Amino acid sequence: MMNEYGASWWDIPQGKIHSYLDSVHFSYPNKAFFISEFGLCEPNFKGGDQRRLEDLVYHMAIYESKPYVEGAIYFDLTDYRTHYPGTSEKTKFRRRVHGIYDMYGNPKPSKKVLRELSSPVEVQQARQWKKGKLNLLIFGSIGLPQHTVKGYKLYVSAPTENYTSTKAYALPDIIPGERINFEVDDLYNGVGIVTIVRPNGYIVTQKDFSWEEKDQ
């Protein structure tokens, strides 16, 4: 278990993170390798949520390319107040701006990116294949994390609708790497927003398969 802050707290080039992780694994080849922290720690390392988003995508891609990396924890969920002296902000109410939510619980753009990267299920295509029906190509994720999907529900909605007002489809159990073709009603002429939720109601992925001629 180790924290990984390449190109921020660790002043090394991003391209060296790959070889650094390999060197640690080589030293302990029989140990499980878990990333206990990674992320962008503002205000010490400035760049805003755009940098946080880019950092998140880059580091997750590295971890998913390493078969020995068992998991990774993003640091952290929300921004917070701190008295920690290492924080560069000098006001009375110093902040650690580390989160994908601000201190008031408002999501940043990086929140959706982390949610999609962390989903145990991927919806890759929505295709019309027979009258009145839409075929969705779905995979069990083999990235981080990966686990069997049980009791999840799927919704297809228009961009202006709340997905909870539409029909709920029960997904079958899906194991990591498994491919399924899932049939739903084609209510929006081959387009729509596909939302998948856990048994507790939390969204794990939400993808927009709608488009307009001007977008092409």
What label would you give each PLM region?
Residues 2-216:
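Substrate-binding clefts and catalytic carboxylate motifs of secreted carbohydrate-active enzymes
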